[in-house]
Amino acid sequence: KIKILILSFLILNSAAFASDERLLKDNFLKSSLGLSEVPMHSYIILKDDIEDGVEKILKDTYHLPVIKYWKSGNKVSFILEAIGKHEFITTGFMVEDNKISDAKVLVYRVNYGFEIKYDMFINQIKGNSMKDSKKLVKRIANISGATLSVNSMRKLSKLSLYLYSKI
């Protein structure tokens, strides 16, 4: 009986977490695009030159073969993920006119390095653009104890700008 009770509790909590995560993503998309409803998404298929560009930015392959994006006018929002130290960091980026207008850490699954969620860090990303295909215009400062998470955010910032240029 206790095993069944524990298993039921775990299943219910994982379903609640999934719906909370979906709500966070939807709220980011509506807010960043300035809409009352989440628009239909489109896909960027990671193949050929796009896949090569993604691999150069991430120094690895992206974990999915396609990346979803949501568009409203010249605003494009992406929900992107990267591994921090051990777990995925789920982020939202909105790019407009080749600049990151909005960024947010939606789900942070690690116990340390969580400082990247705060405005003090995120504000370094907002307004950033790319000098060339490799560097951001504004430097993103490191956070002691969160180096891997900061590096992931740098890569995802570059990735969002790169993907925007391919739409």
Indicate residue ranges for each PLM-predicted region.
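Sec-dependent N-terminal signal peptides
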Residues: I4-L12
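Flexible, solvent-exposed loop/hinge segments and secondary-structure transition points
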Residues: A18-I140, T147, N151, K155, ...
